[in-house]
Amino acid sequence: MNQTINLCLALHNHQPVGNFDHVIQQAYEDSYLPFLDVFEGYNNLRISLHTSGPLMEWFDNHHPEYLDRLAALVSEGRIEIVGAAFYEPILTMIPSRDRIGQIRDYTG
């Protein structure tokens, strides 16, 4: 008897505002980049990925080629981007205008 198992793999990448560049760079070298290198080799694997706004900005400023690789995988349907508020607040704890602004900043 063959059974199919469906697994939803959702990853969350984050670095807090104000973290030192060398700390984020080390996380990039030890985690974010190696994961992407391995993931690209598994053509049948699909994931959902959330990257916080501050980390997305850091990638844009320091490793835009990483974002290009993510964009290519999104275009191929291999990565689904999970949206959120930019600075990862608890949305119910902040004013409505701030919720809207943070979501716009993240998707902007």
Which residue stretches match the model-derived regions?
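Catalytic alpha-helical scaffold of carbohydrate-active enzymes acting on polysaccharides/glycoconjugates
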Residues: 1-108
